[in-house]
Amino acid sequence: MFRTEDSILPPLEWLSDNNSSVPPAIYDWLMELGSMTLRFERYCTRVHVEPRHEYFIARNELKEEAEHLPESSLYWLREVVLMGDNQPWLLGRTVIPQETLAHHSNALMNLGTLPLGRYLFSNGELTRDYIHIGRKDSLWARRSRLRLSGKPLLLTELFLADSPLYTEDPS
């Protein structure tokens, strides 16, 4: 259950909050406050998750993520590829302090192929502290600190080239 591999996410460049280089249609996606899974479902017949990494890491393995999360003895790391009709649309990385896990009976450790949003948005006690926008070359990313029953977790999402974020709305 401890770290054995490197992250599936490449290093990302985080933009300043007043950066105006984000096209409006992209910005709308990146600032989505609801479930990204539900939004993706409007563009395909099936959304599913392929888990890549699920294990505990120490604080010194968080790098810049450490400044967004409280001290904890361990953090649960979950990295997934979110697929739309079997096309990779998003790389997701969730970092959860052990205290957040304990508050939710460790349910967040047992999501398997369930998209994180299905759990978080069905809970009813979810808030979002902020969304930071980032990039990796021509790909867009976002990082959110969420609170589930007041307990923090950090979610980073990189939207891959086939993601509907880069296309027009289906309507």
Curated annotation (Swiss-Prot):
Cystine pairs: none
What class does this enzyme belong to in the EC scheme? lyase
Keyword annotations for this protein? Cytoplasm, Lyase, Pyruvate, Ubiquinone biosynthesis
UniProt-recorded Gene Ontology molecular function terms: chorismate lyase activity
What EC number(s) has UniProt assigned to this enzyme?
A: 4.1.3.40
Compartmental location: Cytoplasm
Instruction: Tell me the Gene Ontology biological-process terms attached to this UniProt entry.
Output: pyruvate biosynthetic process; ubiquinone biosynthetic process
User: What pathway, per the record?
Assistant: Cofactor biosynthesis; ubiquinone biosynthesis
Q: Kindly list the GO CC terms recorded for this protein.
A: cytosol
UniProt function note:
Removes the pyruvyl group from chorismate, with concomitant aromatization of the ring, to provide 4-hydroxybenzoate (4HB) for the ubiquinone pathway.
Matching entries from NCBIfam families are given as:
PRK11655.1
| Family, similarity comment | Belongs to the UbiC family.
- Descriptive protein name: Probable chorismate pyruvate-lyase
Write down the species.
Bartonella bacilliformis (strain ATCC 35685 / KC583 / Herrer 020/F12,63)
